[in-house]
Amino acid sequence: MTNYFRSGDEIHYDCEIFEQTTSKGQGIRFYFDDITTLFPAEERVATIVYNVGLLINDAESIDDSEYLLNIDDPVIKTTGRAPMENAVKAIHMFKECVEALRHKYSNYKIAFACGWLDSRRHDAYRRVLSKMGFYETVVDDEPSLFRTYPAIDWIGYEQMKMAEMEEICDGE
């Protein structure tokens, strides 16, 4: 995970980047841009809001500057040689990224907004993310899939993880 900071005219971006390479040499990269300041102060009390960007491309050709410089108007071409493998890996990776960010900022509610470039991606994202509790709304004048996760209750979280481990052990 890498932090990128870019100062624009009046906008400050904090972008967390997670990446993996698939068996076919494709790079999957998630960009989590902190857009908390776009929301009114009363709506963002103890909340961090991320806009989620996804880039799948040849691992050697991924260039952060292409994404970060076009962050306000991202038109990025993505390719995929193994769409099913990439989709499965991206779903697992997204869940891991969400958990990592929730743990990093455990005292805050964390919200994620996922946009799309075309109707094909909208349908795919909606199908996957709606199963994860995301719903359609408008964020920063753009249609998005959105979800807010509560701050982590560490006692409840530890109890939940222990119960999961007991289920795994009982199943073996």
Where are these regions (language model features)?
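Non-catalytic substrate-recognition and accessory regions of acyl/acetyltransferase enzymes
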Residues: 1-172
